[in-house]
């Protein structure tokens, strides 16, 4: 990618804080987050940038560092504040006094590759929401709190699940920090743990239902979304490592194949299996991330079962891949999807026009978002969409929901919401 010189905007020096942010959400499972086992390099390859921030989740910016609160805007580095905390899984050769803690992810590097293309007074605000080992068809649901987000044991994606509540709540929070902020893209990397389940074929429909719900839940913030619509925000869906395709060939075609050829829906698949020469993209397998002792670098080869991210090493991309091919291709996909608009071509901040009904927030503390909760046959079983039934049963058959009530009982369908007080005080509309 070639850098673009932008005219008509103030030049921002190294110590300047951005006036506003393009928001990039990072969601999915382990290959979307800091699972690269090679030594972090915060003084060189993994150096932070003052224009790249993240939403906080942990109580300190770095282990033992400055205090922060949930959803604060803090500096982004190589080990972001995802649902799963990788900050204590230190490399045995790490010098913690130099900030070489935890593992390496690609979020910082995606943002670095986008910086040359955005106005100089803007930054990138990353919203990390990944959880290793998470799936749509298996895994513990965990819990969600508006004060702390999804619990670390949350491992199930789907409409209404704690991981989804975390995703939508943090995305809203990032936009509400500043009425100038714009949701640019969602980088999604998920599917491995669904492939290992007998119910893997359900993953594509469950993903689509969640995608539709995410966009519906953000309609009240359309003005702060790319191109003025949550439906226009691209979902950039990344590939997985060669191990998964070699081990689960049929399942791979079903799960990852369902991300392909959906550009008309704003869903873009990004292949990572091999590089431009057809060589497998490097993983945490020791032979693929060796030590370079004379250069002072130690790879995944130096980790043991006391500190590796996973015992099955080729299931995760290496630190080098997360600095190179993965952010290269993800950032390019984002620019191909959103970069050919006036905001990028002119190098000026996009104009935020209030959505019909005046849903654009006027300040950080205002949330006038529209909550849309749906039950649609096309989106799969009711339970998968976050609904639960009492004193009865509900079953999807031939595109129709069939409800059977218990004798002498009155059945009810319920769905959790993340802001029950607003629903109670402001009311809503029911459409059948």
What are these regions (language model features)?
Residues 33-38, 279, 382-388, 412:
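Short, solvent-exposed loop/turn elements at domain surfaces
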Residues 391-412:
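Short carbohydrate-recognition loop motifs
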Residues 115, 125, 374, 429-431:
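Residues within well-ordered beta-strands of beta-sheet-rich folds
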Residues 94-104, 413-430:
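Extracellular/lumenal carbohydrate-interaction signature centered on repeated Trp-anchored short motifs
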Residues 4-358:
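Cell-envelope and extracellular/periplasmic
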Residues 370-372, 400, 427-431:
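Intrinsic-disorder/low-complexity, polar/charged segments enriched in Ser/Thr/Lys/Arg/Asp/Glu/Gln
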Residues 357-391:
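Extracellular carbohydrate-recognition regions
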Residues 366-368, 396, 406, 423-425:
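Surface-exposed coil/turn segments at beta-strand junctions on protein surfaces, enriched
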């Amino acid at each position: 990618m070639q850098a673009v010189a932008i005219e008509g905007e103030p030049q921002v020096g190294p110590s300047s804080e951005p006036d506003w942010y393009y928001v990039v959400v990072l969601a999915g499972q382990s290959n979307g987050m800091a699972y690269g086992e090679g030594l972090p390099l915060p003084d060189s390859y993994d150096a932070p940038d003052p224009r790249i921030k993240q939403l906080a989740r942990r109580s300190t910016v770095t282990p033992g560092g400055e205090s922060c609160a949930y959803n604060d805007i803090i500096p982004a580095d190589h080990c972001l504040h995802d649902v799963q905390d990788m900050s204590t899984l230190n490399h045995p050769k790490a010098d913690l006094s130099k900030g070489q803690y935890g593992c390496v992810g690609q979020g910082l590097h995606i943002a670095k590759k986008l910086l040359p293309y955005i106005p100089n007074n803007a930054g990138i605000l990353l919203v990390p929401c990944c959880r290793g080992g998470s799936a749509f068809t298996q895994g513990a649901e965990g819990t969600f709190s508006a004060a702390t987000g999804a619990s670390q044991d949350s491992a199930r994606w789907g409409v209404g699940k704690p991981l989804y509540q975390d995703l939508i709540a943090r995305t809203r929070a990032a936009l509400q920090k500043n009425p100038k902020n714009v949701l640019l893209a969602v980088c999604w990397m998920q599917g491995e743990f669904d492939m290992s389940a007998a119910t893997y074929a359900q993953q594509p429909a469950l993903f689509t239902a969640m995608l539709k719900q995410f966009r519906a839940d953000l309609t009240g913030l359309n003005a702060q979304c790319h191109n003025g619509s949550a439906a226009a925000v691209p979902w950039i869906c990344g590939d997985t490592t060669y191990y998964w395709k070699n081990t689960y060939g049929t399942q791979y075609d079903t799960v990852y194949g369902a991300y392909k050829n959906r550009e008309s829906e704003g869903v873009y698949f990004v292949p990572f299996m091999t590089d431009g020469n057809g060589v497998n993209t490097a993983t945490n397998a020791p032979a693929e991330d060796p030590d370079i002792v004379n250069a002072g670098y130690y790879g995944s080869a130096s980790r043991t079962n006391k500190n590796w991210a996973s015992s099955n090493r080729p299931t995760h991309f290496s630190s080098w891949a997360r600095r190179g091919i993965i952010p290269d291709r993800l950032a390019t996909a984002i620019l191909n999807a959103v970069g050919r608009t006036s905001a990028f071509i002119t190098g000026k901040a996009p104009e935020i026009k209030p959505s019909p009904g005046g849903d654009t927030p006027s300040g950080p503390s205002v949330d006038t978002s529209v909550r849309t909760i749906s039950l649609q046959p096309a989106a799969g079983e009711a339970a998968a969409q976050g609904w639960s039934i009492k004193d009865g049963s509900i079953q999807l058959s031939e595109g129709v929901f069939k409800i059977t009530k218990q004798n002498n009982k009155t059945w009810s369908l319920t769905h959790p919401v993340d802001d029950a007080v607003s629903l109670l005080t402001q009311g809503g509309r029911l459409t059948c």
